[in-house]
């Protein structure tokens, strides 16, 4: 038998303190869950908006690319594409939301000078290049948001599990334990009162 369940005043204080801490823990978990859910909902809305922008920009980019293919030839467009440098400026940092590490993706802004001569190409190629650069920036942002949303969803699930354990197991346990110890102490006090009353009555009779 757990010594902490013995009906003593010390154990009653411990049980009540544990119950108080469990309630505080549940309130904190519930608050954290609500904050994370709000953050997640905001990210979901943002991801939908960025995805729409990507879809529109992709269509614009491919339309411009098709025109460029017709105007200067597919071979020339491919040759120009080989001059596009590999993206090496991507940096990943993190920030914390209620203890959840969220990625921050940074990169040098697009829109740098083209790697080809203007006189040898057409405006359609410039439009395609600019659109694809915009798609790249949007995709980087979307990847950051989707990864953040995944981490928040996992944290929400974990937080909900802890909150449920406090609400359905820990709090009822210490509520019942406090009641049982208090009832047992009260019963002891009644028995002691009855015993002392009996002793007093016997003394009165003897005198």
Residue ranges: model-predicted function:
Residues 1-207:
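Charge-rich amphipathic alpha-helical interaction elements
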């Amino acid at each position: 038998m757990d010594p902490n369940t013995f009906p003593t005043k010390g154990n009653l204080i411990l049980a009540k303190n544990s119950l108080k801490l469990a309630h505080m823990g549940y309130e904190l978990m519930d608050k954290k869950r609500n904050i994370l859910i709000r953050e997640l909902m905001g990210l979901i809305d943002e991801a939908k908006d960025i995805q729409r922008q990507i879809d529109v920009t992709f269509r614009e980019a491919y339309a411009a690319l098709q025109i460029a293919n017709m105007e200067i030839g597919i071979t020339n467009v491919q040759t120009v594409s080989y001059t596009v440098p590999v993206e090496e400026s991507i940096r990943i940092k993190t920030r914390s939301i209620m203890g959840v590490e969220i990625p921050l993706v940074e990169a040098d802004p697009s829109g740098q000078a083209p790697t080809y001569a203007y006189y040898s190409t057409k405006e359609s190629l410039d439009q395609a290049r600019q659109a694809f650069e915009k798609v790249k920036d949007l995709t980087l942002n979307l990847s950051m948001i989707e990864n953040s949303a995944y981490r928040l969803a996992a944290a929400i699930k974990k937080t909900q599990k802890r909150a449920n354990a406090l609400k359905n197991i820990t709090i009822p346990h210490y509520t019942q334990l406090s009641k049982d110890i208090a009832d047992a102490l009260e019963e002891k006090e009644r028995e002691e009162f009855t015993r002392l009353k009996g002793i007093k009555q016997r003394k009165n009779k003897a005198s």
